[in-house]
Amino acid sequence: MKFSIKMVVAAVAVFAGGAAMAQSTFDKINSSGKVVMGVRESSAPMAYAIGSNQSFGGYHVELCERVLKEIVPKAKIEYMALTAQNTMPLVQNGTVDIGCGPTTNNLTRQKQVAFAVTTYVSQVRAAVKADSPITSIKQLDGKNIAASAGTTAVQLLRKFGKDNNVTLNTTLGKDHFESFMLLESGRAEAFVLDDNLLAGVIANSANPKGYKIVGEVLGSEPIAILFRNEDPAFKKAVDDSLVKLMKSGELAKVYDKWFMQPIPPKGQALNLPMSDTLKKLIQEPNDKPLEAYADQ
């Protein structure tokens, strides 16, 4: 399988993808000879840019690469860097064939795109500086908090503030790197995001020991690979390939590589063992949305 890299300007690509909708995903890939994989630039360990040559890696990137190698072995992979904000429209209109960032599966998004079986369950928490006295989200009442635009953390913070009668002043970064810079520079007291992504940002920072993850869990979220809606053949192929990786133990090996072992670029290990929830999902795969977890 051949590989190439493509960066995207969202405003252009959103309008360029309409023609792709008339074809099934497999037809589009077969006619073009390539498959467009949506990735992220700063979402370690799930999907992120590594090195000056802008290669991409991460847990979800590797899972996607393995799936594509099985279901479209002759296609060239073209990597397209996305953000949390433009992922939905670019997958929905067919510009991106498969989205491999850390995207939460929820009912609202299911109206726009389809999700594969869940491959990670995140917990949304807060990162603060190591010497910060903050141990609870409630202690951030009236303080500035960083969050990344387009992430579910924004809605969770709004809900938490309303439910607990606290004022959470949220400043949005365009991506996780920019949001972390708000914390790093002191312009924010905390950065709220999925625990695994917080750990990845901290591990790749200039001072990994200078930060800690604290506070109550704002929400548990199923994270999954995504693709166009109303394309059951492509969904079945992706799901079948992922389930095969789960049952063979290969998915667990990929998890260990990115969550327990040292990862690039700084060789820092996140040391995030697989949760019991994900272990159960590997035994009993499903594509249930966030709302199903809230009802449990």
Label the predicted regions:
Residues A22-G99:
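Extracytoplasmic small-molecule ligand-binding "clamshell" domains
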Residues I77-P89, S132, T170-L182, G219-E221:
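Short helix-initiation/N-cap motifs at beta->coil->alpha
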